[in-house]
């Protein structure tokens, strides 16, 4: 594909299993505008485990050196996109810079010269989005950037999201989202950045249930320090529980928590960010900012007296590693003490199920409290005539229990 793709408003495109959409990395026109996949109508990507849909670049360009090269734009669901399904789909090598001539700049979604494309963008507060069983990897910017809509984000693998900033999942005002059962490996900053930034009379409070996710190696690659697994701010109602953080730089942060319920300041004080499990390896990071926190080990970051830790409120019941008790989750196949904290290449041989006797199998929240029930577990979300349900809460930490 050497030109921009647009699904027109009022139309839909179905991409069947096994289809590969290969983007030209040279861009469009004399300005080399990164190729963008614009969804003004509806998009249904219907891959299978055996035959996923693929959005990528030419095979010879799928290299480690190009992990953050931003070889094409990304999928941009505009404010006229009513619904989108991304199931069993691989999206990789995205993150081209938004420039003059980029459709997203012309449409006012992003600003030319200031933004890079996430893998997936949404921008319709009335939209419905289901992103499941997919792989979002190797991108300059965020994996998913939600600026509107109802969404289920479940059972996905995120890897190497963000070159010098960015998150796996980034939520803004106008969204109601369940984020569950995902693996998030080496997001540049956070696995979850949750904010009600942009809230207005028409764009409502961001509401997020984030549970049973496994976040690994978050925060270490960032140029400077800002978060390191979960970051909740600006009046977001965020219930973040039963997640497993492994070798992340910091614990959950809630900046400006002394000024809650303010779209310009702190998160909603009705949020529950607790009952999480913070595991650490013994290895030292090869990137340490001595002039900032000086944190060089995951356990040190978890126990650092950070100004954005809302002590006594956040993580009161969480299980937190220390230097002398690293809380090894006992994964089936992941060397928690060996994989470099700044590693971003995902090994398909890893297995984040846990072995019998793993400490992540005890101490989690039952999830039965009314305020912790997923938004779309009962009635679900209807996309293309099919009802999709969020996963039920599991009384364990992380995405996977016993194999």
Each PLM stretch: what is its role?
Residues 1-8, 12-16, 24-41, 48, ...:
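Extracellular beta-rich repeat passengers
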């Amino acid at each position: 594909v050497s030109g921009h793709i647009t699904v027109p408003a009022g139309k839909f495109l179905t991409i069947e299993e096994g289809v590969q959409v290969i983007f030209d990395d040279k861009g469009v026109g004399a300005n080399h505008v990164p190729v963008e996949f614009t969804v003004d109508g509806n998009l249904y990507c219907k891959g299978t485990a055996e035959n996923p849909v693929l959005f990528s670049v030419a095979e010879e360009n799928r290299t480690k050196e190009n992990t953050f090269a931003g070889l094409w734009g990304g999928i941009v669901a505009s404010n006229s996109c009513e619904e989108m399904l991304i199931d069993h789909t691989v999206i990789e090598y995205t993150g081209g810079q938004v420039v003059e001539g980029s459709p997203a700049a012309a449409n006012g979604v992003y600003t030319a010269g200031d933004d890079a494309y996430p893998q997936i963008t949404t921008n319709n507060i009335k939209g419905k989005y289901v992103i499941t069983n997919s792989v979002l990897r190797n991108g300059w910017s965020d994996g998913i950037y939600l600026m509107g809509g109802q969404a289920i984000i479940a059972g996905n693998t995120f890897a190497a999201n963000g070159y010098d900033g960015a998150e796996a999942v980034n939520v803004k005002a106008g969204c109601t989202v369940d984020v569950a059962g995902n693996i998030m490996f080496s997001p540049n900053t956070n696995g979850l950045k949750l904010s009600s930034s942009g809230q207005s009379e028409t764009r409502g409070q961001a509401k997020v249930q984030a549970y049973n996710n496994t976040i690994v190696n978050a925060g270490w690659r960032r140029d400077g320090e800002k978060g390191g697994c979960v970051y909740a701010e600006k009046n977001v109602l965020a219930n973040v529980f039963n997640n497993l953080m492994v070798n992340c730089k910091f614990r959950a942060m809630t900046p400006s928590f002394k000024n809650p319920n303010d779209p310009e300041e702190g998160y909603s004080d009705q949020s529950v960010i607790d009952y999480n499990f913070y595991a650490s390896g013994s290895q030292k990071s090869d990137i340490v900012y001595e002039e900032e926190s000086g944190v060089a080990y995951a356990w040190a970051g978890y126990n650092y007296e950070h100004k954005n830790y809302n002590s006594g409120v956040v993580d009161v019941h969480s299980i937190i590693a220390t230097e002398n008790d690293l809380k090894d989750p006992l994964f089936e196949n992941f060397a928690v003490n060996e994989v470099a904290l700044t590693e971003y290449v995902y090994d398909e041989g890893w297995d984040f199920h846990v072995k019998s006797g793993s400490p992540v199998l005890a101490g989690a929240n039952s999830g039965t409290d009314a305020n912790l029930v997923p938004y779309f577990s009962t009635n679900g979300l209807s996309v293309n005539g099919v009802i999709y349900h969020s996963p039920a809460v599991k009384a364990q930490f992380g995405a996977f229990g016993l194999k």
